[in-house]
From Swiss-Prot:
Entry-linked InterPro entries: ATP_synth_F1_ATPase_gsu, ATP_synth_F1_gsu, ATP_synth_F1_gsu_CS
CDD domains: F1-ATPase_gamma
Protein name as it appears in the record: ATP synthase gamma chain
Principal localisation: membrane
Amino acid sequence: MASLKSIKKRIVSVKNTRQITKAMKMVSAAKLRRAQENVVAARPYAKKLGEVLQRLAKSQDESGSPLMQQRLSQKALLIVVTSDRGLCGGFNANICKAAERFIKEKKAEFAEISVTTVGRKGYEFLKNRQKIHKNYGNVLANLSYPAAALLAQEMIEGYIAEEYDEVYILFNAFKSVMSQDITLEKLLPIAPEAASTEEYAPEYIYEPSKGELLAELLPKHIEVQVFKALLESVASEHGARMTAMDSASKNATEMIGKLTLQYNRARQAAITTELMEIISGAESIKG
């Protein structure tokens, strides 16, 4: 049986760990609230912009914008969004595995698949497994629209220069604290959705022309989609870390209980042994 001193040392160590996990849970909860508010605010804007773009795109020839042109798909770019830090359960591992599945499934379709990573964990996992086109580090800690727009603009420039023919983004979409959905979205080329099935579709008067608006809104649409995906990932990360730290704290409490019971039994056994020795010694003196 382990000594009383070693058991007590383990109890102190686990208690210290529990303090850390509880603190991390509280920090993640505070960050999650802010991140969740950002996601909720971004979703309606992204949806409405997509609707406006859809109306414009339906009445335009796709050859009018390079971002809508369908061409022979030979090269693809996959943007993989993970976190910069760990201790968030399977958040990063699940995304990285999904990225590997995508690459494996699309190998026959594309001659070349490049990967852009957002977040240190994804880069560290994929750098020895796949060609990394670029890594964006330290973007998510203080996420801003200009940072997301820069990523989107560099991606658009590469697409126009025909460095790749299709662009996808893979991220964790935020559903709830306990649930994050791995989501794959195709960013480029932009395909106008099928015409509305509604009997009455209102006509809009656009100023300036539809072509000018489309040229302005297409890049903006990509920027917004990238920004929303990053916001979703940040909220998902905090939710996953909060859940993981809560689970770790509960496990630590359970372990402390088991170690305390073990300590009490060991202490009781030691006291019993001492008493037996005292009694034996007393009997020897009497004899």
